[in-house]
C-alpha cells in the first residue's frame, strides 16, 4: 500500500502511519516523569503503557542509528488515541519488513545480550539486568506500517472507510471461523465498507 498507492520510496518518513506490535511500558513512564518535572501541579496521566495494536503517526526522525546488530530511528511519535500524546523514542526498524509479528524470541535474546555487554563492568548481576531493562534501545518501539492491518490487529478499532480483502483469509469455504472473521471485519467500518475478492455466494439476490 505504502509503495504502490502512496508512492513512498524511502525506508520510513515523516507522516507515516505505524502500528505498535509489542506492549511498551518504558516511554510512557519516562514521559510522565518529564511532565511532572516541567509542571509539578499537573495531574499524572492515565496512559501507563503503549499497547500492542495502538497506532501512531511519525512526526519526525532526528537520526538513524545502527546498534547491537539492529537498525533504529530516534523519532517523535504522535498517538491519536491518546489525545495526540507525543513521545520521543527509539523506533526499531527491523520489524517493519520482517515476516514475524514482532521480534522473534531469538532476536530479542540477541538484542538483550548485546545490550548487556555495555554494562559488563557492573559487578552486580541484578544491577546489570536493571540497566538493560531501562536501556532505550532494548525498549525501542517495535512497529509495522499501519496502512493495511489484519482483522485480528483491527479488533477494538474503527475507521470511517474499510476495505475487506477475503483472499487474506484464504480459499476456505464458508465456516463458523470465517463468519466470525467477517463479523469482526465488517463492524470495523463506521461509514463505508468495500468488499474485495468476495465470491457472489456471499451476497443475497434481491
PLM features: what roles do these ranges have?
Residues 1-205:
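Core RecA-like ATPase module of SF1/SF2 helicases and allied nucleic-acid translocases
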Amino acid at each position: 500500500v505504502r509503495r504502490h498507492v502512496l508512492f513512498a520510496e524511502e525506508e520510513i518518513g515523516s507522516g507515516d502511519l505505524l502500528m505498535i506490535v509489542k506492549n511498551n511500558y518504558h516511554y510512557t513512564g519516562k514521559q510522565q516523569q518529564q511532565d511532572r518535572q516541567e509542571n509539578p501541579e499537573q495531574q499524572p496521566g492515565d496512559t501507563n503503557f503503549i499497547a500492542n495494536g495502538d497506532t501512531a503517526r511519525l512526526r519526525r526522525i532526528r537520526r538513524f542509528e545502527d546498534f547491537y546488530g539492529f537498525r533504529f530511528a530516534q523519532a517523535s511519535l504522535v498517538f491519536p488515541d491518546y489525545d495526540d500524546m507525543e513521545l520521543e523514542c527509539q523506533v526499531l526498524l527491523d520489524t517493519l519488513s520482517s515476516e514475524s509479528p514482532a521480534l522473534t524470541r531469538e532476536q530479542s535474546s540477541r538484542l538483550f545480550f548485546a545490550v548487556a555487554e555495555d554494562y559488563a563492568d557492573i559487578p552486580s548481576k541484578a544491577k546489570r539486568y536493571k540497566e538493560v531493562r531501562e536501556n532505550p534501545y532494548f525498549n525501542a518501539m517495535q512497529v509495522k506500517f499501519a496502512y493495511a492491518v489484519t482483522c485480528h490487529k483491527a479488533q477494538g478499532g474503527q475507521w470511517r472507510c474499510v476495505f475487506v480483502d477475503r483472499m487474506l483469509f484464504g480459499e476456505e469455504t464458508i465456516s463458523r471461523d470465517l463468519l466470525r472473521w467477517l463479523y469482526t471485519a465488517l463492524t470495523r467500518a463506521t461509514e463505508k465498507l468495500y468488499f474485495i475478492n468476495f465470491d457472489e455466494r456471499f451476497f443475497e439476490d434481491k
